[in-house]
Regions:
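Conserved SAM-binding motif I beta-strand of class I
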Residues: 257-262
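Mobile active-site "lid"/loop adjacent to the S-adenosyl-L-methionine
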Residues: 304-334
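Non-catalytic accessory regions of SAM-dependent methyltransferases
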Residues: 1-123
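S-adenosyl-L-methionine
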Residues: 266-308
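Conserved SAM-binding loop of SAM-dependent methyltransferases across substrates and taxa
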Residues: 243-256
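Non-catalytic substrate-recognition/targeting regions of SAM-dependent transferases
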Residues: 107-120, 140-216
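C-terminal catalytic and target-recognition region of SAM-dependent MTase-like enzymes
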Residues: 303, 330, 344-406
Length: 406
């Protein structure tokens, strides 16, 4: 057992923590020992002195303690972090297809009891994002352990790239930066920022330095397959295409034509590159999706009979959910107005704050206003390498629906 400074929490926080939720807010702390520094591991106790868990302490954050262990006998040394790495990796090896090991989320924060940490594997490159100060302090022990775990399982690692260029780090009192992680386990001569991966039989070039988030969105892996199954012979419009993943899967599935839109020039160029290297016919175009859909509606243009809506999160806060609701409703309404009877709509939200019930409400309102009836074909969530903890609703964020206009 490790001797740690103590934090005593309220009864309400104790019940939440014992129920499996790892976050303790500053307002829920009754007492904290003197001398605790930001990023320290603390022992969390109830007002009666009962052990609740061990967690990262950060007074600069609203989430003041992030519990990551409920075993009072844990010692937080290199061996502990390597065990955590092994547990996360072995879960993926059990639930994912073998062909997905080279494009897989290895660590999904709280769902892996590693608060604020994301690790994606793109071939032999790891892309890492650290959003909690405690994990930043223990990053070296964990990442070195992770590299060893992967190599022990014959999974190569040539370099690790840190994508810590996100503003949310400042809320934890950390600086933004990006660059290669250096370790005696890694050869600087092997460093690279672009790597090719294969997902669902399609080759992509991933830019871990400049791509969105960690470089590529892995959470829609199986949703793309579902979308492709009904695309044969269809004229498809893929909105917010990013690197073209939905467009390429549907094109591979036999679509008659595929147009992929994104407001980002870099995204459009990467989509065109990915289409070319796979020998797939996809027209990649730079456009504002809202304006494009509005213009099609004005022209009464019904040439597309399958539309994919995979927008970025319109809200990252509960405070802006109402504005996000309007944004989601607007694009879904426009898509429904454009689609002919018998056409298909794939629509998604990647915001936790836009919950499943609220998203369904939005879809129903959009359909009512567009004067259409929807037939639900399928509902899906994020891929299993992004696991959902039933006690931590924040780990559930991705909703994916397939509808037909009837």
């Amino acid at each position: 057992m490790e001797h740690l400074k103590k934090v005593i929490i309220s009864k309400r926080a104790e019940l939440a923590a014992k129920g499996g939720h790892p976050w303790i807010y500053g307002t829920e702390i009754e007492h904290a020992d003197e001398g605790i520094e930001a990023g320290d591991i603390v022992r969390v106790e109830s007002k009666k002195g009962k052990f609740v868990g061990s967690g990262f302490y950060n007074p600069h954050s609203k989430i003041t303690v992030r519990i990551f262990s409920t075993n009072a006998n844990d010692t937080f040394n290199a061996a502990f972090w390597k065990r955590r790495a092994a547990y996360a990796v072995d879960y993926r090896l059990q639930v994912m297809r073998k062909e997905d090991y080279d494009c897989c989320r290895l660590v999904f924060g709280e769902a892996d009891q590693l608060p604020g940490l994301t690790v994606d594997r793109f071939g032999d490159v790891l892309s890492v994002q650290v959003l909690s100060l405690g994990m930043e302090r223990h990053k070296k022990e964990f990442l070195d352990g992770l590299i060893e775990v992967l190599r022990e399982r014959q999974l190569a690692v040539s370099c690790v790239y840190e994508r810590n260029d996100v503003k949310i780090r400042e809320l934890e009192g950390m600086q933004q930066y990006k660059g290669f992680y250096r370790s005696p386990l890694l050869d600087p001569a092997a460093e690279k920022t672009r790597v090719d991966i294969v997902e669902n039989g399609i080759r992509y070039t991933v830019d871990v330095e400049n791509g969105q988030k960690t470089g590529f969105f892995l959470d829609q892996k199986f949703n793309r397959l579902a979308a492709a199954q009904i695309g044969k012979g269809r004229h498809v419009l893929d909105c917010f295409t990013h690197t073209g993943a939905f467009a390429l899967n549907i094109a591979k599935g036999g679509a008659a034509s595929v147009t992929a839109l994104d407001i980002s020039r870099e995204a459009v160029e990467m989509t065109a590159h990915n289409a070319k290297q796979n020998g797939l016919a996809v027209e990649a175009a730079q456009a504002d999706v809202f304006d494009f859909l509005t213009e099609l509606d004005k022209k009464k243009d019904h040439s597309y009979d399958y539309i994919v809506l995979d927008p970025p999160a319109f809200t990252k806060s509960g405070k802006t959910v109402h504005e996000a609701f309007r944004g989601y409703k607007e694009i879904n309404y426009r898509a429904m107005k454009i689609l002919p009877r018998g056409g298909y709509l794939a629509t998604c939200s990647c915001s936790h704050f836009m919950g499943e019930e609220l998203f369904v409400k939005m879809v129903k309102e959009a359909a009512r206003d567009a004067g259409v009836t929807l037939r639900q074909i399928e509902f899906r969530q994020q891929a299993p390498d992004h696991p959902i903890l039933m006690t931590v609703p924040e780990t559930y964020y991705l909703k994916f629906f397939l509808f037909q206009i009837v």
